[in-house]
Amino acid sequence: MNLDRVIAVRTNKTVYRDGDKCIKVFDSDYSKADVLNEALNQARIEETGLNIPKVLEVCTIEGKWAIVSEYIKGKTLSQLMQEHPEKKDEYLRLFVETQLLVQSKTCPLLSRLKDKMNRKISQADLDATTRYDLHTRLEGMPKHNKVCHGDFRPSNVIISEDGTPYVIDWSHATQGNASADAARTYLC
């Protein structure tokens, strides 16, 4: 694999292009379990029929874990908004439509958002009474099963040359309440 062409640098990872492949190489101290979970999430989302890059392989490169997937030629919505501020409303509409499409799908094998939130509450630096109250409130909420991206932002939507939106970065994907996922998008 040729790792000469860097296309993105993010916390704990660098993304490269090698022809028609995209190679996300994680830092050497990045958890193997987290890499495999991200690849598994992406593979499971492929089965929903959403436009996403297909996982081709998971491997190690010079002792670092990597996910190899299809390269999607295009620009992120974030890039397009910066390059064409006069079209920002059009791009925001496409962004919202894409999130609604993602959230219209179900994927029963994804982890549950409620379980993830329960773990986060348990690990939070809160007194026992507050943790108990939060766990109780969370348990009392209705059960949902919609696909939740978990990090939906304009930099995670690539618009291909033919105008098709592709959603990337499925490391935080869960199934749960689509409104909670939309709220997270709005707050971030």
Predicted segments with their positions:
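An alpha-helical support segment within catalytic cores of ATP-dependent transferases
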Residues: S104-G150, I158-D162, Y166
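Short beta-strand micro-motifs within the conserved protein kinase catalytic domain, predominantly
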Residues: K54-W65
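ATP-binding glycine-rich loop module of kinase domains
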Residues: D4-L36, A43
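AlphaC helix of the protein kinase catalytic domain
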Residues: L77-E86
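Structural motif at the C-terminus of the N-lobe alphaC helix and the adjacent alphaC-beta4 loop
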Residues: L40-N51, V102
